[in-house]
Amino acid sequence: MKRLLTGVVAVALIAIGGVTPAFAEAPEPDALEQILDDTAPARLEGDDMVARTDDVTAVLPADVEQPVTLSTPGGQEVSVTLPSDGGTAATKRVGDGAVEHELGDGSSIIPAVRSNGVLQVMSVMSDAAAPTTFTYEVAAGDGGSLVAQPDGGASVLDRDGQEAATVAPPWALDADGRSVPTHYEIDGDRLTQVIDTAAAAKVTYPVVADPGVSVTYYRYDVIDVRRTMNWTNRGVQLAICKVHNGAARGTCTMSASYEVESAIDATLGASKSGIGATIGVHESRTVKGSVSWTSPSAPAGSSYKAWAVGTLVTYKIQKWVGRKTLGMRYPVWTLEATSRTLSAFDPRVGFAVGQ
């Protein structure tokens, strides 16, 4: 038996270079226009633009010094601090879900939320005097770091070392659609895109570049679910009695009240509440009752114990990782890990007695 547990989403930026190879093989001169034509609807909330899609909420501040933030139900917030020249940027809305921050150094920064909920941040170099490096700070939750990948991209890790996003290999295009050499440099949570215009045979301005991160999702499936009803939980003892010495035989009596809580094993990052909802065991259920029992006649020194009873559920957890790229409404899922056999205990009123 296989059951869907809970989709837990970690959100981030996404790059065109990792998802639309056509731009690298046969790039279009109007790549920026194509991107802006596919932005998600956004509305002004205070001074910020807020775009919402099926699973992502993106906040695009009017102030370039304030980070762009992305969040999803059940996922960590991801913040992206944009490049800035330290001055006051002229900001305007472009497209339905994008803003342009025109800096005073010949460059513009354009964060755009795509229709499928991914975020692209374009850096535009207006002429040869514009800067050729653009630094972003990418944080997952209250911390995180970047780890370089062999393909030229990077992984964005949260403080616990779990991937919150993946940075796709960088791309840069000039006004005629020619690729311009570019690469990333990583320092902690700082991602710097270097556009090597000097290495290009010919460059027609403006040049558009886009660092990016593909969205990382997490899903947990509960599989191999098996139930044992009226199971005696010998790990939860409720009472004990012993036939006293001094006579050949005798009886003993147990009398006690008890409280027994449900128990759920969890691993791989899955929540106990999510597992419980899937297998039908409440995470914080408490059963109260009492034990009142007298043994049959037994030899002196005999002892009896009372244990909790209920339903034993055994299962395994599968952890799936999903990544959504441009042009994809739904992520592609990959199985990352399968747990050992785990168990949950759902108590009921009553007890079992044994020696």
Show the residue positions of the predicted features.
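Short, surface-exposed loop and linker segments with low hydrophobicity and enrichment for Pro/Ser/Thr
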Residues: 6-7, 56-65, 125-128, 147-148, ...
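Residues that cap or anchor secondary-structure elements
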Residues: 25-213
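Deployable pore-forming modules of oligomeric membrane-permeabilizing proteins
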Residues: 210-259, 323-354
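Membrane-insertion modules used to breach or fuse lipid bilayers
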Residues: 248-299
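Membrane pore-forming effector domains from diverse proteins
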Residues: 284-340
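Short, hydrophobic/proline-enriched secondary-structure or compact coil segments at domain edges
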Residues: 66-71, 261, 308-309
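Short, surface-exposed linear segments at secondary-structure transitions and domain or protein termini
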Residues: 87-92, 173-180, 285-289, 342-347, ...
